[in-house]
Curated annotation (Swiss-Prot):
The keyword Transit peptide applies. Mitochondrial GTPase that catalyzes the GTP-dependent ribosomal translocation step during translation elongation. During this step, the ribosome changes from the pre-translocational (PRE) to the post-translocational (POST) state as the newly formed A-site-bound peptidyl-tRNA and P-site-bound deacylated tRNA move to the P and E sites, respectively. Catalyzes the coordinated movement of the two tRNA molecules, the mRNA and conformational changes in the ribosome. GO terms for cellular component: mitochondrion; nucleus. It comes from Drosophila mojavensis. Belongs to the TRAFAC class translation factor GTPase superfamily. Classic translation factor GTPase family. EF-G/EF-2 subfamily. It is found in: Mitochondrion. It comes from the Eukaryota. This is Elongation factor G, mitochondrial. One of its GO terms (molecular function) is GTP binding. One of its GO terms (biological process) is mitochondrial translational elongation. The lineage of its organism: Eukaryota, Metazoa, Ecdysozoa, Arthropoda, Hexapoda. CDD domains: EF-G, EFG_III, EFG_mtEFG1_IV, mtEFG1_C, mtEFG1_II_like. Pfam families: EFG_C, EFG_III, EFG_IV, GTP_EFTU, GTP_EFTU_D2. GTP binds at residues 51-58, 118-122, 172-175. Pathway: Protein biosynthesis; polypeptide chain elongation.
């Protein structure tokens, strides 16, 4: 009888403390030595756990930390014991049972260091997922066995594709009523376009969930003892042998299509060994040509240890992923440099700041080291502003707890204190190499709300909170609107802004009032419009003189959130030193349109010719000429308003399908697809964000509280003519003006 099995028969508190000691004893390390040790690059994995909201990511991470001996006992997400999950360290997260910030931790499994980032599933916190994926080498995509592929799963999948992150899929919640992992697999193939196949099968689902079948090693695995800590290996049950053979054959066929080596064995009809299949799984997973699908239920402690084995066996180490830096020099194209992932510290240090957080000891900056080594006392430079920083303290994170380390190497994720920087900044030890890493993609905010502190005495704390949150989160914007004399905050959704309002009260003692949500409309041109503007001012002494000629035209619909400036001038009519002034003036005018007061976007400004005066011309004069040219185009061009369109997914019982479809149509929604299963239906639609406010309460009342929906930003699209007229009228009234006689889009 092993030490662990003997302990399982004792009393619970003793059992749990001894269990942890026993697990550390098995690994042959004391707790601190085990985690502080530096490993060779083959023994490191940087992984993220991503999924749709409520798929069980945080519960899965909690189980991983428990089985690897990182925590002594497990807690649930909405903790009945008032403790909450380890990774949900923010009080608000424990209350709501959702993950808001990406918590970072590291642990050890089979002598491999695993750095884990637990990411939010709610679409309003999508920038947290972007940041996490940017610095990871692999990911676990968690899917619900009942819900399957949902809207945020599609978003996470797109983000993984953007950053080329290899992934494993884990179908969780097999114990839930209505779970169907086979349907989820077919959705992965049809909706996510993954070449995916099971490498495990469930032995029973719902209340009959007993264990799993490993198709690679052809054996059954049962999870026994306290918290499923003992693995019992057995033969595949008699009633599952035919299905196991069929699914193993399917796995080999999918792998053979993606892997040349295995494909040759398959065509020559040679026998496969377990090692052949494992090697092919690793090669194809790293290349993103195949996605291994695992199954389990984290809440019921089944399938987690084999998932950890798969992370070690199939996901890449930092040396197997190519990371690039760019050398930027004026007047030259960006030059790509492949970074050296070796953990010897011979190359200069390169690191990327992917997250900022205001902790108890000042600003905490999370970094990933991509090349070289960093030690306490070293100096590093910010590639963006060339500021020098001395490293006083290096820490590794376990949720909100810190462990000091003396040095970090390529592949490590760590944090620094007191570094003044922005998310996405590159740090290096050599300030002269002009190298920087690609910055993190940040989506534009789509919702604004007026915000004000309830008490005037809290203004100082309000300012501190705003300053901290805007620095931490690049999707959270803040500005004071002079026209309406209100402070506006903008973000990715109502929940996003509500959570910041609650954090202000909780963390800064500053209760605030949020106004009604406002949509971030845009204004754009319908067709090209030429301009020829002369700015001339003579008031004694040197005057101002600038003439610019060109055309403003719409960009293609796929680029309608961008602004472009093109200098097409030839000769010296517009001296080159004044061209930046024209661009600056154009971009300043694009901050506020004249139709509705919203930003201009989807426009290209082509500067073709102009004129200057040898004495009176200056950059300021050309900037003011650009202001005048944009005003001229506003008067002469045809304009339209763009609005954000959201991808909406609604799930409800079948008897409410008619009501749900009717409500979406009433809100100008376009139904793009429907599907149904076992008494429930899901409808997919594209709906203008402006029409989605108040939908949550309408859905609850029309489905007796059983319906739920998610939405995410899709694109900007022209709004309907009557909506445009209403927006323009409201803007004119707010400015105290009558409706202008203005050319509108002819429909």
């Amino acid at each position: 009888m092993t030490l662990i099995t003997r302990v399982l028969n004792g009393n619970l508190p003793l059992r749990l403390s001894t269990l942890k000691a026993a697990r550390q004893l098995q690994c042959g390390y004391s707790s601190h030595a085990k985690y502080a040790e530096h490993k060779p690059i083959e023994r490191i994995r940087n992984i993220g756990i991503s999924a749709h909201i409520d798929s069980g990511k945080t519960t899965l991470t909690e189980r991983i930390l428990f089985y690897t001996g990182r925590i002594a006992e497990m807690h649930e997400v909405r903790g009945k014991d008032n403790v909450g999950a380890t990774m949900d360290s923010m009080e608000l997260e424990r209350q709501r049972g959702i993950t808001i910030q990406s918590a970072a931790t590291y642990t050890v499994w089979k002598d491999v260091n695993i750095n884990i980032i637990d990411t939010p599933g709610h679409v309003d916190f999508t920038v947290e997922v972007e940041r996490a994926l940017r610095v990871l080498d692999g990911a676990v995509l968690v899917l619900c066995a009942v819900g399957g592929v949902q809207s945020q799963t599609l978003t996470v999948n797109r983000q993984m594709k953007r950053y080329n992150v290899p992934c494993l899929a884990f179908i969780n919640k097999l114990d839930r009523m209505g779970s169907n992992p086979y349907r989820v697999l077919s959705q992965m193939r049809s909706k996510l376009n993954h070449n995916a196949a099971f490498i495990q099968l469930p032995i029973g689902v719902e209340n009959n969930c007993k264990g799993i079948v490993d198709l690679v090693q052809e054996r059954a695995i049962y999870f026994e003892g306290e918290h499923g800590i003992n693995l019992r290996l057995d033969e595949i049950p008699q009633d599952m042998r035919v299905e196991s053979q069929e699914r193993r054959q399917e796995l080999i066929e999918h792998l053979s299509n993606a892997d040349e080596t295995l494909g040759e064995l398959f065509l020559e009809e040679k026998p496969f060994t377990e090692a052949d299949i494992k090697a092919a799984l690793r090669r194809t997973c790293i290349k993103r040509t195949f996605t291994p699908v695992l199954v389990g239920t984290a809440l019921k402690n089944k399938g987690v240890q084999p998932l950890l084995d798969a992370v070690v066996d199939y996901l890449p180490n930092p040396g197997e992923v190519e990371n690039l830096a760019y050398i930027e020099q004026e007047g030259q194209e960006k030059q790509q440099i492949v970074l050296n992932p070796a953990r010897d510290g011979k190359d200069p240090f390169m690191g990327l700041a992917f997250k900022l957080e205001a902790g108890r000891f000042g600003q905490l900056t999370y970094l990933r080291c991509y090349q070289g080594a960093l030690r306490k006392g070293d100096n590093i430079y910010n590639a963006r502003n060339h500021k020098k920083v001395r490293i006083a303290r290096l820490v590794r994170l376990h949720s909100n707890q810190m462990e000091d380390v003396n040095e970090v190497f390529a592949g490590d994720i760590f944090a620094l204190f007191g570094v003044d920087c922005a998310s996405g900044d590159t740090f290096t030890t050599n300030p002269k190499n002009n190298m920087s890493m690609e910055s993190i993609f940040v989506p534009e905010p789509v919702v604004s709300m007026a915000i004000k502190p309830n008490n005037t005495k809290d203004r100082d704390n309000f300012s501190k909170a705003i300053a901290r949150f805007t620095k931490e989160d690049p999707t959270f914007h803040f500005k004071f609107d002079n026209d309406i004399k209100e402070t506006l905050v903008s973000g990715m959704g109502e929940l996003h802004l509500e959570i910041y309002a609650q954090r202000m009260e909780r963390e800064y003692g500053c209760p605030v009032t949020l106004g009604k949500p406002k949509v971030a409309f845009r204004e754009t041109l319908v067709g090209p419009c030429e301009f020829d503007y002369l700015h001339k001012k003579q008031s004694g002494g040197s005057g101002q003189y600038a003439r610019i000629i060109g055309v403003m035209e719409p960009l293609p619909p796929s680029q309608n959130t961008l602004l472009e400036f093109v200098d097409e001038t030839v000769g010296t009519n517009v001296p080159k030193q004044f061209v930046p002034g024209v661009e600056k003036g154009y971009r300043e005018m694009c901050e506020r349109g004249m139709l509705s007061g919203h930003k201009l976007s989807g426009i290209r400004f082509r500067l073709q010719d102009g004129g200057h005066h040898i004495v009176d011309s200056s950059e300021l004069a050309f900037m003011l000429a650009a202001h005048g040219a944009v005003k001229e185009v506003f008067q002469n061009g045809a304009w339209q308003i763009l609005e954000p369109i959201m991808l909406v997914e609604v799930t409800a019982p079948e008897e409410f399908q008619g009501a749900v479809m009717g409500h979406l149509s009433k809100r100008h929604g376009i139904i793009t697809g429907t599907e149904g299963t076992e008494g429930w239906f899901t409808v997919y639609a594209e709906v203008p964000l402006n029409d989605m406010f108040g939908y949550a309460s309408e859905l609850r009342s029309s489905t007796q509280g059983k319906g739920e929906f998610t939405m995410e930003y899709s694109r900007y699209s022209p709004c309907l003519p009557d909506v445009q007229e209403q927006i323009v009228r409201q803007y004119q009234e707010s400015q105290g003006l009558g409706q202008p006689e203005k050319k509108k889009k002819k429909n």
